[in-house]
Amino acid sequence: MSKVDFLHIKGARENNLKNVELTIPKNKLVIFTGLSGSGKSSLAFNTIYEEGRRRYVDSLSSYARQFLGGTSKPDVDSIEGLSPAISIEQKTTHNNPRSTVGTVTEIYDYLRLLYARIGKPFCPKHKIKIEGKTTKLIIEGIVDFPKNSKLIILSPVVELEKGTHQKLIAKLKTEGFLRLKINNEIVSLSDDKEINLDKNKRHSIDIVVDRIVLNEEKKLEISEAISIALEYGKGIVKVENVETGEIKIFSSNHSCPKGDFEMPKIETRLFSFNSPYGMCQNCKGLGVQLRGDYNLLVPDQNLSISEGAIKIFESTVNSSNQEWQEFEALLNYYGIDKNIPMRKLSESDRQIIKYGSKEEIDYIIKSQSNKFKRTKRIEGIIDKVERKYLETSSEGIRTWIKRYMSEFICNMCKGSRLNEHALAVKINGLNIWEISSLSINDVYEQSINLNLSDYEREITTLLISELTSRLSFLVDVGLDYLTLNRMAESLSGGEAQRIRLATQIGSNLTGVLYVLDEPSIGLHQKDNERLIKTLRKMVEIGNTLIVVEHDEDTMRASDFIVDIGPKAGSHGGEIVALGSVEDIIKNPISITGKYLSGEWQNATPKSRRSGSGNVIKITGASQNNIKKLDFKIPLGKFIGVTGVSGSGKSTLINQVLVNAIEKGIARDFSHDKNKNYEKIEGLLYIDKLIKISQSPIGRTPRSNPATYSSLFDDIREIFSNVPEAKARGYQKGRFSFNVPGGRCEKCSGDGSIKIEMFFLPNVYITCDHCDGKRYNEETLQIKYRSKSISDVLDMTVSDALAFFENRLIVKNKLQTLEDVGLGYIKLGQSSTTLSGGEAQRVKLASHLLKKSTGKTLYVLDEPTTGLHSHDVSLLLKVLNRLVDKGDTVIVIEHNLDVIKNCDYLIDLGPGGGVNGGKIIATGTPEQVAQIEKSYTGEFLKRVL
């Protein structure tokens, strides 16, 4: 191989990397592995990818660079042979409620085009195919106007489009038209006055073709006008009754012969819920509406109205408040008793309380000195909060009202986001919303089995080829269970990453360096093989893949492995071993090699816990693909929830169980609309539910392991009790870098100063006043055992454990951090530099320190994300310690090392999406392994 066939990195020192030198073969599948925090991401993303991105951005103009964000040069001497780099990380970046799987993959765009080309409109009422009207039928429709009506015949040429439209207006003027109707106003073209339209606003323009008085003699004139209007309006003509304002729309394109349903021109924008042309006008294309929620307005049905059952009248009941007097008049008019519990009211009474009177009511409003008689319809509590929410200009009032509102499925489009015209168009009996509601696998099957005429096949061959190609890529990366209308913001990090991966495969780029972050996360072993084939395919077409990965199957399928370590943090950052799987196994100091060879492994427990004997039982769980499911959680055990991707694991635990227990603990069952189960039993056995994720332990660089675990409070207490500190009157707050007093004010306790570079990325330099120590000179003079507070923050957990050996409270907290494998991290290390696995273990350590009641339920969703097999062994020790204290731990997991260590498994399936949502097996890992239809059981047999 020549020099250009390799990527050469020299002197990489980003984060904990120790002057790394490395040569990687190009056009290969390269795996970066090592313990959590060893420096894998620092090398792959922060060095190689960032340098590739920086070189690309630097090639652009300074004007373009300001829109792309700053790119600082990684701390590396040189990188040679670098190709254009694309990063695909585990991040859900689409927070827009309008983004769906279909839109982010652009598959929905192809579907819109397909429906615009070969879709057939059907009348939603009569279910018959819609055909265009002839001129004769249009004239017959016009004659239905009253005799001698003054009519304007209009030809729509622009509908809700941005722009000045100057060229069109000038063209129409030269063609002899005298008037236009612009945004519902008649404008003369005969005047010399120029028509100026705002280019940033949407406009509608109709040509005034003719103005006539309707009678028998005008039929010929009407016919000629209609012909002209249809020509310019592309098959659409509007007829307006000047006196009544009534407008009839006729189409030579599409209209129901049995009714008044008219189809606009079928084009791609009709099927977009982001376009005013296609969106449901009621919910503006969101599919949901914010409306008053009766369960929030009346949270306690056992109270009467007089006792304050209705929250918005809670403080004004029986007062002189005008709104209360109006509402009381409503109650009196219908004879509703305000002194009985709300639950005892009839349904008709509740409807009146919700939506008010249908007719006008006579009532009297009393003030301190006067009485006023009024007659009007009185609104109900739901109407009231919705009106106030829309009318108020006060953000405070709007926030207060929003407490009593929830998102409900739009009652007009039923959540489809589209208007009735878009939903009327069908292919093979399905409209675009119905096809988007199918799983990707089903959409693929529908696409390749379309029943088309020769003409339709000819005009859609390339379109269907592109559509099925993109769908097949999503199937290949294990996302066949997703639906196209799934909200993008609801995707897990692994799902979002694999969607971007599928998009890149579809681009067919070659000569690219892809950097991926654990693409196997969230994938069942059953689906992992397809993912590996996809990665190999990307390599085969001429790309280099650097994949940060811990999955053994992926490592064994790779061409080259880089093992980084030997441990984590300051004890990592070096290349331990590189080469083939065999090369890694042969290396005596490679921890990865020991696990690959089987020398080290996470052993299967010799026995399973029997638990406390108590259970939580949920009956009738229904959410997403889970329908009327009954299940139980045995307490005092380590429980694993398993199943193929999309089988319903997260739905069952995060959306059903967690929701039910949180409301049960809070005794809050007011959100009946969100109640996705029929019954829950055993709540008395749980007094606390804790979800532990891999999210950062703090949002700012100021947060660190010492502050999160409250360890820093104890350390500051120790320093405040030093004799010198007492003599100076220093309190505990003096040793905080977050508040004025003891911190360095030049850098505000950051230790570094940001310098704005405008078109270049911002530069951070060490504060020259405190030399990066964060504190002022007076504070640093206070020493405990010859160390300042800054020196202590710079210690690793292991060093601090020896330093504070005689301080029991501090020692216990440090020992717990050491026990979970975090002895290498520094006490003052910024939380933003911790990996997901490290952040999770800091959280677990803080919970280990708390006294157990035996009634705590811990829930973890894929806790092994980012963890090496050695890290998994540490995680298992921590989780087992929590269970040994009498608490219950539930993990949603695919990792077999974790699954085989569980006491009890709940395996869902058999497939994903609509093919999942059922409990396939429950019991110990040994019992599940015997269930033939369990995919998890099939793989468990190999490791038990």
UniProtKB/Swiss-Prot annotation:
CDD domains: ABC_UvrA_II. ATP 1 binds at residues 34-41. The gene is uvrA. The UvrABC repair system catalyzes the recognition and processing of DNA lesions. UvrA is an ATPase and a DNA-binding protein. A damage recognition complex composed of 2 UvrA and 2 UvrB subunits scans DNA for abnormalities. When the presence of a lesion has been verified by UvrB, the UvrA molecules dissociate. It is found in: Cytoplasm. Forms a heterotetramer with UvrB during the search for lesions. Gene3D superfamilies: ABC transporter ATPase domain-like (1.10.8.280), ABC transporter ATPase like domain (1.20.1580.10), ATP-grasp fold, A domain (3.30.1490.20), P-loop containing nucleotide triphosphate hydrolases (3.40.50.300). One of its GO terms (molecular function) is zinc ion binding. Keywords: ATP-binding, Cytoplasm, DNA damage, DNA excision, DNA repair, DNA-binding, Excision nuclease, Metal-binding, Nucleotide-binding, Repeat, SOS response, Zinc, Zinc-finger. Belongs to the ABC transporter superfamily. UvrA family. Residues 1-242, 359-597, 610-935 form the ABC transporter domain. The keyword Cytoplasm applies. ATP 2 binds at residues 643-650. This is UvrABC system protein A. Pfam families: UvrA_DNA-bind (PF17755), UvrA_inter (PF17760). A zinc finger (C4-type) spans 256-283, 744-770. GO terms for biological process: nucleotide-excision repair; SOS response.
